Swiss-Prot record:
InterPro entries per UniProt: ATP-grasp, ATP_grasp_subdomain_1, D-Ala_lig_Van_CS, D_ala_D_ala, Dala_Dala_lig_C, Dala_Dala_lig_N, PreATP-grasp_dom_sf
Compartments where found: Cytoplasm
ATP-grasp domain span: 107-300
Protein name: D-alanine--D-alanine ligase
Membrane-traversing stretches: none
Binding, Mg(2+) 2: 267, 269
Lineage, top ranks: Bacteria, Pseudomonadati, Pseudomonadota, Alphaproteobacteria, Rhodobacterales
UniProt binding sites for Mg(2+) 1: 251, 267
Principal cellular location given in the protein's record: cytoplasm
Family the entry assigns: Belongs to the D-alanine--D-alanine ligase family.
Catalysed transformations (reactions): 2 D-alanine + ATP = D-alanyl-D-alanine + ADP + phosphate + H(+)
GO cellular component: cytoplasm
Cofactors (names): Mg(2+); Mn(2+)
Length: 306
């Protein structure tokens, strides 16, 4: 089922929501709504709350542009609601969204597709705080959040295991830390667009991602041709392995000292940041597609049964 054939379809842009990434989603949603209006679409902005079903029925959009980030908006929940209401929507469907959001399950899919991932395990927070569950350096993070929310890096020089914030879940992912460069590739439809080298003063955390001057993006990344092509290949294969649709962004770490063997896939984001200076729109722009054109493409690509 595709979107309405109306020449000026009505688009509901979902944003905000209750997740830890609410503020980022509000920025993405407002930028996308403005861009879609500029492309001639009729737009209604919806801050997703417990009354979302009623508000969707009342606004009666032809298509939903999903600009939600994090849990509930990116993990298959809102996608299931939209399938039930039979409203065409952007980006990935229920299964791909749920799979990509679960870092452990997505790693199983990557391994099955022959994609390289860092060693990892799930562990109880009590065990993580009691002793090193992996030889440092390693990373501790929620297995079902994005935007580097709740991420801890335990260095080789650490005197002991980390003391975790009390609001983190009881089960967390512990992952081998891969030194080196942070790289990212966007997939649009069936094409991997480019590779961005993300340069920061330290870890690419929430602050570096969303604060002005927190990071610098080099596009195209200055990489050996083999590594550049591997990023494109791995991102497209990850997109397909998870069953993604529309737009996705896959992030990597590359340890230059190990050559091609040092490139590891971190995760695939089915709802990447959507402001004109976000990674995915930057790569689309480098491919000749403006931010407005990217948003319009996503609306035109929308469907149910994704």
């Amino acid at each position: 089922m595709g979107m309405s054939s109306r020449t000026n379809p009505k688009v509901a842009v979902l944003m905000g929501g209750p997740s830890a990434e609410r503020e980022v989603s509000l920025v993405s949603g407002r930028e996308c709504a403005a861009a879609l209006r500029g492309e001639g679409f009729e737009v209604v902005e919806l801050d997703a709350g417990s009354d979302l079903c009623d508000r969707l029925r009342a606004s009666a959009p032809d298509v939903v542009f999903n600009a939600l980030h994090g849990r509930w908006g990116e993990d298959g929940c809102v996608q299931g609601l939209l399938e039930w209401l039979r409203i065409p929507y952007t980006s990935s469907g229920v299964l791909a969204s749920a799979l990509a959001m679960d870092k452990e399950r997505s790693k199983e899919a990557y391994r099955a597709a022959g994609l390289p991932v860092a060693a990892s395990q799930l562990a109880d927070r009590a065990a993580i705080e009691a002793a090193h569950v992996m030889q440092p350096p390693y990373v501790v993070k929620p297995y079902n959040e994005g935007s580097s929310v709740g991420v801890y890096i335990v260095t080789e020089a650490a005197n002991g295991p980390p003391v975790l914030a009390p609001d983190l879940p009881a089960t967390l992912m512990v992952e081998e830390y891969v030194p080196g460069r942070e790289l990212s590739t966007t997939v649009l439809g069936d094409r991997a667009l480019n590779v961005t080298d993300i340069i920061t003063d330290g870890w690419y955390d929430y602050h570096a991602k969303y604060s002005p001057g927190g990071s610098r993006h080099v596009i195209p990344a200055d990489l050996p041709p083999e590594i550049f092509e591997l990023c494109l290949d791995y991102a497209l294969r990850a997109h397909k392995a998870l069953g993604c649709r529309g737009l996705s962004r896959t992030d990597f770490r590359w340890d230059e000292s190990r050559g091609a063997a040092g490139l590891f896939l971190l995760e695939t984001n089915t709802q990447p940041g959507m402001t004109p200076t976000s990674l995915a729109p930057e790569q689309a722009l480098a491919a000749g597609m403006s931010f407005g054109q990217l948003c319009a493409w996503m609306v035109e690509d929308a469907s149910c049964d994704r």
